[in-house]
Amino acid sequence: MCSIIGYRGKNSAAPILVNGLQRMEYRGYDSVGIATKSKNQILLRKGIGKVVEVNNAVQLDELPGNIGIGLSLIHI
């Protein structure tokens, strides 16, 4: 199972994506990742654990860019 969230707008995408993934986390996840687009580059950060754990480890919410996608997975 997985949850996917996307954002495109004027604000920084990463904090919005992290917040959205946290709101869907009640299911319990094994891994999470975020990709954003900034200056014609796609930037990716990911890790194993709950959203807050991965965010603390790799600073998901600090990725630059105002377009992005977030994904969380539970491995069954």
Q: What label would you give each PLM region?
A:
Residues I69:
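C-terminal active-site-proximal or functional interface alpha/beta core segments in diverse enzymes
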Residues I74-I76:
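Conserved small/polar residues in nucleotide/adenosyl-binding loops
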